[in-house]
């Protein structure tokens, strides 16, 4: 197994992974044009020619035969060019002594608290390879 930086040459393999992942993995779109643009950004990021706001690092996992079987990525600083939304888990309390009511309700709050933080993205391992702890390499 080998983890390495993704390149434009990995486009066909990443497109196949994106198709396998389906629409739920929004950071790995099943669009050849979008993936190619992203891979160009990835190459520029590893070359050190982009600012933190634009840097996007994508890795691929190869098996012993050289086949790309998984991917993971890191955005250097999420949300510096477009909004980066996340959820914060909080608590909503409803109380009334007169009605003898006290209730705590776990609540998700939409925030931008992680703006500027690094973010893991595009984490996917092809179904036939989800064994032997290969996912830990990603």
Task: Mark where each language-model region is.
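Conserved acyl-donor/pantetheine-binding loop and adjacent beta-alpha core of acyl/acetyltransferases
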Residues: 76-122
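Active-site rim helix/loop that mediates acceptor-substrate recognition in acyltransferases
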Residues: 18, 22-69, 73-81
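A short, internal acetyl-CoA/4′-phosphopantetheine-binding micro-motif in the GNAT/acyltransferase core
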Residues: 62, 120-131
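Residue-level detector of conserved, well-ordered beta-strand and adjacent loop positions
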Residues: 4-7, 62, 75, 121
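A short beta-loop-alpha structural element at the N-terminal edge
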Residues: 2-14, 27
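Conserved glycine-rich acetyl-CoA-binding loop
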Residues: 113, 126-137
